Design a protein with these regions (language model features):
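Active-site-proximal alpha-helix that buttresses catalytic centers in soluble enzyme cores
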Residues: 2-255
């Protein structure tokens, strides 16, 4: 195994940048809304055994024989319809989240670097971890941006970090946030986002509906556990909405 080269250590040198960092990891996005870019992105995404749990040979034939020949062009048109001037909406909003979190921590006196990575596409998890390490970071909190734990999402991020760690000699201290679907801060933020919207636009006549992304039927037991966590998240959010008819405004939507 070949390891990445390590920079020479300078004794007594004080770090000029934060040595603790938060790595926000989102699912991923193509680099641009074109068929070639979608083909690269889908090939990486759909080749992950965490995402598609069927025999590898069978899936390889389906993926390369059918999906990557047909889907990129269709998906590119859909991406183009939502593409922002600053790029992919998912990447743009993830970067904005990172900036808000960095500002929130900085205002409270925490000297912490915050950066973002995509599990599939760019910037990759490995490239961002390389940059953090080169900047002198020695402690990293990895935060997959999925409230409910799931193998194709959260565990796949852990896989990417582990793959980077395998080729790195001097590892930083690594910690992972596994799930936060029932964290009081997260639940409160969800509830206040709904309530803030109601204050501005009025309360709708019909009930609110939560529509999480589905799971493959082949893993129904695993999907049921994810579904239960989704229900708990929404039930606790609804409790706050019902118990606070006139709640105080949320604080600037900070993380």
């Amino acid at each position: 195994m070949t390891f990445l080269p390590e920079p020479p250590h300078v004794h007594g040198a004080a770090p000029s940048s934060p040595t603790t960092a938060v790595l926000l990891c989102n699912l991923g996005t193509p680099d641009e809304p074109t068929a070639p870019a979608l083909r690269r992105y889908l090939a990486e995404f759909l080749s992950d055994p965490r995402v598609v749990e069927i025999p590898r040979l069978l899936w390889w034939l389906i993926l390369h024989g059918i999906i990557l020949r047909v889907r990129p062009k269709k998906s590119a048109a859909k991406y183009a319809s939502i593409w922002l001037p600053e790029g992919s909406p998912l990447k743009a909003w993830t970067v904005k989240q990172g900036r808000l979190l960095a500002g929130y921590l900085g205002q409270r006196g925490h000297r912490v670097a915050v950066d973002c990575a995509m599990r599939y596409g760019s910037p990759s998890v490995a490239s961002v971890l390389d940059a953090m390490k080169a900047a002198g970071v020695t402690r990293v909190l990895v935060l997959p941006l999925y409230p409910q734990y799931s193998g194709p999402t959260t565990a796949s991020v852990v896989d990417a970090v582990a793959a980077w760690a395998q080729r790195t000699r001097a590892l930083p201290e690594l910690r992972f946030v596994n799930r936060y679907h029932d964290d009081p801060g997260y639940i409160g933020a969800l509830a206040h986002s709904v309530l803030d919207h109601w204050r501005t636009h009025g309360r709708p006549d019909r009930p609110c509906a939560a529509a999480p992304r589905g799971s493959p039927s082949a893993g129904m037991a695993r999907a049921q556990r994810l579904d239960n966590r989704m229900h708990r998240t929404w039930a606790r959010t609804a409790q706050i909405r019902c118990s606070e008819p006139n709640p105080k405004p949320s604080r600037a939507h900070a993380p």
